[in-house]
C-alpha cells in the first residue's frame, strides 16, 4: 500500500513531530532542496511543535552508509553508498525515555486509562514516558514489539517500551509487519496508487536484490468528539527505492511496486470489533483501520534471531528469513460475512480498503475458532499453521484470516494475534515426531512395567496358579531382566506412537508367553503349556535380589524354594491314575498294586511293623536283582545291548515340587480344619439331633470293634475300594434302586426315633 506524503505527514502529527535538528539547519536544507516542502506540511509541523510534542526525525540508513533525511526536507538526491547495501528507515527523537529491555508492544493499561483522548489525541502536552523512543540498539529478538532491522547490519534500531508498560496487561494488540530480505517488490496493478503520490518527499536508490521497507502506523484521535481523525485511516506501506528521484517515487515515475503482504488474524474464542469507516476524502486514501480501543505495535524488521528465549517461536522460510510471531492476547475477533464480502469487492476494485464515515461504522464479528476466511487474489493459504503464505507471484497485498482450530483449539490458550508478513516460504515445522514418540514410548514402558509388577504381586498370592515362578536361581534373574528390557525395546522400536495406544491385553499376554519361553530356553528346559493369564515372573524376578545378612544361608533357602517349570505329578498320586486303578482299566497294573497292598496288610496282622518293612524291602530287592541278572544274562546270550532293564523307571521324574507339596498340604489342612470344627460342634452340642446321631454311631462302632480289629477293617476297606467301583459300574441301575429303598427306610426310622425323644426338633 503506497502512502500519500501529505496525508502521511499529517498522520505523524499525533505521535511523531517533524524535526530533529534545529530550525536553522532545517531551513538551510529546505533551501538546498528547492523548497519542496509544502505550506500545509509546514503548518502542521508548527502546530505539532506548539502542541508540545517532541521533535522526531525519519532517517534512512544502509548497512554501510547512514544519512539523515528529515521528513519535511524534500531533498531530490540519491542515497550514496554501495548498491549492495540495504537501506532502511527509522524514527528518532531528541527526548529519550529510560532504556528498558522490554519492547514497545502497544500494551495499554486496562484499569487506569481507556482508549480515549489521552491515548490518541494529538493535542496537549505529553510526558516523555508517553512518547516511545527509537534508538539504535543491538540485534533484536524475534518477539520484539517495534523493530527496524537490516539483514546484515551490526547496528539495528528498535523501539523500547515505556517503563510503566512492563506491568502485566490483560488486553493488548500485537501487529507484526515484516518482510523477507530476499523478496522483490512487484508491480501494483492499481492505477490509483500513482495518482495518490502528487506530493513526495524523496526517493532512495534501489538495488535489484534488496527491498526497502518503510512502514509507519499511527492512530490520531480527535480531542473534540473522540473519533478517529478522518485523514488518518490507514497503514502506509513501503515503496521500492529508485535512482531517479528522492525517497519516494515521483508522480511521473513508473508504476510503484509493493511486496505482497499477508495479514493474519488468528484468534481463539476472542472478540475484536473491526471497523471500516469511509474516508471523506474519497477512495484515494486506502488502508486498514482498526478499532479505537487498540494500541498497536508496528514492527518493521528483517529479524535474524532464532533464540529459544523468544516469547513466540519464529518461523523461518527457505531463504533463511525469520519472521517473529505476534504476542498472544485474550481477545475475540469478529466480523460478519457481509462485511467480508464488501471488503473483498473493495479490494478487487481499488486494491485497498474503502472506508465509511464514523457515523455509519458498525461492529461485525466472526468466530475465528470455527471459520477460516482467506482473501487472496491469487492463491489460498497452504496450511493453518503457516504464518506466511505460499504465493510470491502477485504484487497485491493479501489479507488472510487464519484459524487455529485444526491444531487443538480446546487445549490451547484463549489467545489471538495479528501478523502482517510477506508470503512465501514453507510453514514452520511442528513439534518433532521423535520427541513425541520417545515420550510415548517411555510412558508405555513405565505402564507395562507397573502392570507386570502388579500382576506378579497378585499371582504370588495364589501359588497354585503359578507353578513355575520360583525355580529361577538368583544367577538367572539378571538374564530375566535382560530379556524384559530387550522385549520392551523391540516392542518400542517395532510400533509407532499410535500402535502403543491400540495395544490390547491379548498382545501383552502373548509378550508374556514369549518372555517365559525365552527364559526356559536359557535354562535348557521346555514346557508345553503356559497360561496366558498368568505372569511368568514374580516380583523378585523383576527387581534385583537384595542380599540379606544371613548370606549363604539365605541363598541356600532360595535355592531350595525356586522353581521355574510346572512338573507333572507322580503317576500314583494323580486322580486319573487312581481312577484307572480302581476301575481296573489296566488289569496287570491294578493286580500288582492290589496284591502288594493286601500282602502288606496281612503281614501286619502277623508281624510287627518293623518286621513287615524289612521283609517287604528284602522281597523287593530280591525281585529287582533277579530281574536285573536275568536281563543281563539274556542280553549276553543273545548278544544284544538293550541297556538297563529299569531304564524307563530310572528316567521317570518322581520328585515332588514345592507347588505339589504345597498343594497337598493345603488340601490336608482344609480337611483337618473341617474335621476339627465338626467335632467341636458335635461334642459341644451345638445341634442336639446331630450330637445324638453321632452318639448312636459311636455306640454301633463298639460292636464293630468287638468283632474286628483295625487291620481287619483296613483290609476290608482296601478290598471294597478295588471291588465296589467295578461292581457299581456293571450294575448301576439295580444298585441305585436298592440304595433308594434303604435310604427311605433309614429316614423313616430316624423320624420315629426323633418323635419319641422329648425336646428334639426335626431338622428341616
Swiss-Prot record:
UniProt topology in membrane: Multi-pass membrane protein
Pfam families listed in its UniProt record: Reticulon
Residue stretches making up the Reticulon domain: 578-764
Keyword annotations: Endoplasmic reticulum, Membrane, Nucleus, Transmembrane, Transmembrane helix
GO cellular component annotations of the record: endoplasmic reticulum membrane; nucleus
Protein name per the record: Reticulon-1
InterPro entries referenced in this protein's UniProt entry, alphabetically: Reticulon, RTN1-4
Spans traversing the lipid bilayer: 607-627, 696-716
Subcellular location: Endoplasmic reticulum membrane; Nucleus
Region (Disordered) residue spans: 1-37, 115-147, 247-400, 455-475
Compositional bias segments (type: Polar residues): 261-282
Biased composition (Basic and acidic residues): 328-337
Biological function: Inhibits amyloid precursor protein processing, probably by blocking BACE1 activity.
Amino acid at each position: 500500500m503506497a502512502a500519500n506524503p501529505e496525508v502521511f505527514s499529517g498522520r505523524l502529527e499525533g505521535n511523531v513531530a517533524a524535526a530533529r535538528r534545529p530550525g536553522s539547519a532545517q531551513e538551510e536544507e529546505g533551501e538546498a532542496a528547492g523548497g519542496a516542502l509544502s505550506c500545509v506540511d509546514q503548518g502542521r509541523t508548527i502546530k505539532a511543535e506548539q502542541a508540545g510534542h517532541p521533535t522526531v526525525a525519519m532517517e534512512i540508513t544502509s548497512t554501510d552508509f547512514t544519512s539523515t533525511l528529515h521528513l519535511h526536507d524534500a531533498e531530490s538526491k540519491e542515497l550514496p553508498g554501495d548498491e549492495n547495501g540495504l537501506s532502511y528507515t527509522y524514527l528518532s527523537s531528541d527526548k529519550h525515555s529510560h532504556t528498558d529491555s522490554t519492547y514497545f508492544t502497544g500494551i495499554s493499561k486496562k484499569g487506569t486509562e481507556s482508549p480515549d483522548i489521552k491515548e490518541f489525541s494529538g493535542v496537549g502536552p505529553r510526558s516523555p514516558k508517553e512518547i516511545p523512543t527509537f534508538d539504535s540498539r543491538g540485534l533484536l529478538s524475534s518477539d520484539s514489539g517495534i523493530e527496524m532491522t537490516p539483514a546484515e547490519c551490526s547496528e539495528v534500531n528498535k523501539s523500547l517500551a515505556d517503563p510503566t508498560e512492563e506491568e502485566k496487561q490483560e488486553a493488548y494488540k500485537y501487529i507484526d509487519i515484516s518482510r523477507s530480505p530476499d523478496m522483490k517488490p512487484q508491480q501494483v496493478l492499481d492505477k490509483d496508487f500513482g495518482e495518490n503520490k502528487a506530493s513526495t518527499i524523496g526517493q532512495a536508490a534501489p538495488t535489484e536484490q534488496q527491498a526497502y521497507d518503510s512502514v509507519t502506523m499511527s492512530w490520531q484521535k480527535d480531542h473534540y468528539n473522540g473519533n478517529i481523525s478522518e485523514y488518518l485511516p490507514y497503514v502506509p506501506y513501503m515503496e521500492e527505492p529508485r535512482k531517479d528521484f528522492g525517497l519516494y517515487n515521483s508522480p511521473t515515475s513508473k508504476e510503484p511496486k509493493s511486496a505482497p503482504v499477508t495479514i493474519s488474524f488468528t484468534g481463539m474464542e476472542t472478540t475484536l470489533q473491526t471497523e471500516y469507516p469511509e474516508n471523506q476524502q474519497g477512495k484515494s486514501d486506502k488502508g486498514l483501520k482498526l478499532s479505537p480501543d487498540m494500541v498497536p505495535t508496528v514492527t518493521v524488521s528483517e529479524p535474524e534471531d532464532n533464540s529459544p528465549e523468544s516469547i513466540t517461536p519464529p518461523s523461518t522460510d527457505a531463504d533463511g528469513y525469520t519472521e517473529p510471531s505476534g504476542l498472544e492476547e485474550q481477545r475475540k475477533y469478529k466480523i460478519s460475512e457481509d462485511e467480508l464480502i464488501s471488503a473483498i469487492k473493495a479490494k478487487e476494485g481499488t486494491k485497498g480498503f474503502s472506508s465509511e464515515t464514523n457515523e455509519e461504522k458498525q461492529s461485525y464479528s466472526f468466530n475465528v475458532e470455527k471459520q477460516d476466511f482467506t482473501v487472496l487474489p491469487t492463491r489460498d493459504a497452504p496450511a493453518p499453521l503457516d504464518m506466511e503464505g505460499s504465493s510470491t507471484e502477485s504484487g497485491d497485498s493479501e489479507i488472510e484470516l487464519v484459524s487455529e482450530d485444526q491444531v487443538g483449539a480446546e487445549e490451547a490458550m484463549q489467545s489471538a494475534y495479528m501478523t502482517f508478513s510477506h508470503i512465501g516460504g514453507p510453514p514452520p515445522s511442528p513439534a518433532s515426531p521423535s520427541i513425541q514418540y520417545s515420550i510415548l514410548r517411555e510412558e508405555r514402558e513405565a505402564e507395562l512395567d507397573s502392570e507386570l509388577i502388579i500382576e506378579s504381586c497378585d499371582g504370588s498370592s495364589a501359588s497354585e496358579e503359578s507353578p513355575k515362578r520360583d525355580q529361577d536361581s538368583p544367577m538367572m534373574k539378571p538374564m530375566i531382566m535382560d530379556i524384559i528390557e530387550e522385549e520392551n525395546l523391540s516392542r518400542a522400536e517395532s510400533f509407532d506412537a499410535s500402535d502403543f495406544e491400540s495395544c490390547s491385553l491379548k498382545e501383552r499376554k502373548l509378550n508374556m508367553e514369549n518372555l517365559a519361553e525365552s527364559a526356559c530356553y536359557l535354562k535348557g528346559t521346555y514346557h508345553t503349556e503356559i497360561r496366558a493369564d498368568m505372569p511368568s515372573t514374580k516380583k523378585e524376578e523383576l527387581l534385583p535380589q537384595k542380599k540379606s545378612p544371613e548370606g549363604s544361608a539365605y541363598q541356600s533357602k532360595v535355592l531350595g524354594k525356586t522353581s521355574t517349570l510346572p512338573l507333572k505329578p507322580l503317576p500314583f498320586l494323580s486322580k486319573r491314575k487312581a481312577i484307572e486303578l480302581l476301575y481296573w482299566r489296566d488289569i496287570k497294573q491294578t493286580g500288582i498294586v492290589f496284591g502288594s497292598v493286601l500282602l502288606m496288610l496281612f503281614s501286619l496282622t502277623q508281624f510287627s511293623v518293623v518286621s513287615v518293612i524289612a521283609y517287604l524291602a528284602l522281597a523287593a530287592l530280591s525281585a529287582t536283582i533277579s530281574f536285573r541278572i536275568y536281563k543281563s544274562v539274556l542280553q549276553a546270550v543273545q548278544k544284544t545291548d538293550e541297556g538297563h532293564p529299569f531304564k524307563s523307571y530310572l528316567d521317570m521324574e518322581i520328585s515332588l515340587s514345592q507347588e505339589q507339596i504345597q498343594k497337598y498340604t493345603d488340601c490336608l489342612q482344609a480337611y483337618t480344619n473341617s474335621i476339627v470344627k465338626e467335632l467341636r460342634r458335635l461334642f459341644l452340642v451345638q445341634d442336639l439331633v446331630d450330637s445324638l446321631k453321632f452318639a448312636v454311631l459311636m455306640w454301633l462302632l463298639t460292636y464293630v470293634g468287638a468283632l474286628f480289629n483295625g487291620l481287619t477293617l483296613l483290609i476290608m476297606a482296601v478290598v471294597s475300594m478295588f471291588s465296589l467301583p467295578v461292581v457299581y459300574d456293571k450294575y448301576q441301575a439295580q444298585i441305585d434302586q436298592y440304595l433308594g429303598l434303604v435310604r427311605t427306610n433309614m429316614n423313616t426310622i430316624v423320624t420315629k426315633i426323633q418323635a419319641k425323644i422329648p425336646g428334639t426338633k426335626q431338622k428341616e
